[in-house]
Amino acid sequence: MIGLRPAFSTMLFLLLLTGGVYPLLTTALGQWWFPWQANGSLIHKDNVIRGSALIGQSFTAAGYFHGRPSATADTPYNPLASGGSNLAASNPELDAQIQARVAALRAANPQASSAVPVELATASASGLDNNLTPGAAAWQIPRVAAARQLPVEQVAQLVAEYTHRPLASFLGQPVVNIVKLNLALDALQGHRAK
C-alpha cells in the first residue's frame, strides 16, 4: 500500500495540473492576449453574428464572390463535419467532380476568358477554407460587378482592399477573405445581393 501512495499522489497532481490548471490558464491567457481569436474570430454586423473570419460560407448568388468548394458531408461548410473528400488524385470520381465544378463556374462566369483558378474547382483539406488567392477573386470580378450593377474598377478596388498580404513573402501568399469581402460588398450597397 505504501508503494501506491506516491503513484496515486503523482496521478492526482498531474490530473489537477493538466485537467484543471493548464486549461484554465491557457483559456485566461487567450482571452487576455487574443480575445477576438479566442472567441472564434466572429464577425458582427448590427449586433448580429454574420460569420467567422476563419470559416467559409456557401455563397451562390451571382452578386457574391464564391469561395472554395466545401467537401464537408451533407451541409457545405459544416464545421462539425470538417474534412476533405479523401478522394485520391487518380480517382475518377474526383475528376468528375472537378469537371462538373469547372463547367458550372464557366456557365456562371461567361465574362471570364482565362482558365478557371484551381482553388475554385478543388476543395480544401478541411472543407472550410474561407480564403482565395487574389487571382481567383479577380477572376470573378466581372460577374459580381455585372450582378450588382457596379463598375468593374470599384469591385476590383474592394478586392484589393481586402487582400491580406503576409509580413514577408516567405511567410505565405496574399489571400482574400471571401466572407469579409462579401460583407463589404453588402455594406457598399446597403443591402444583400440577389
Swiss-Prot record:
Q: Mostly located where?
A: membrane
Oligomeric and partner information? The system is composed of three essential subunits: KdpA, KdpB and KdpC.
Q: What is the lineage of its organism?
A: Bacteria, Pseudomonadati, Pseudomonadota, Gammaproteobacteria, Enterobacterales
Give the record's keywords alphabetically: ATP-binding, Cell inner membrane, Cell membrane, Ion transport, Membrane, Nucleotide-binding, Potassium, Potassium transport, Transmembrane, Transmembrane helix, Transport
Q: Which family does it belong to?
A: Belongs to the KdpC family.
Q: Which HAMAP family match?
A: KdpC
Q: Per the record, GO CC terms?
A: plasma membrane
Q: Which function does this protein serve?
A: Part of the high-affinity ATP-driven potassium transport (or Kdp) system, which catalyzes the hydrolysis of ATP coupled with the electrogenic transport of potassium into the cytoplasm. This subunit acts as a catalytic chaperone that increases the ATP-binding affinity of the ATP-hydrolyzing subunit KdpB by the formation of a transient KdpB/KdpC/ATP ternary complex.
Membrane topology designation: Single-pass membrane protein
Q: Where in the cell is it found?
A: Cell inner membrane
Q: Which GO terms describe its molecular function?
A: ATP binding; P-type potassium transmembrane transporter activity
Could you tell me which species this protein originates from? Salmonella schwarzengrund (strain CVM19633)
> What name has this protein been given in UniProt?
Potassium-transporting ATPase KdpC subunit
* TM helices/strands, residue ranges: 12-34
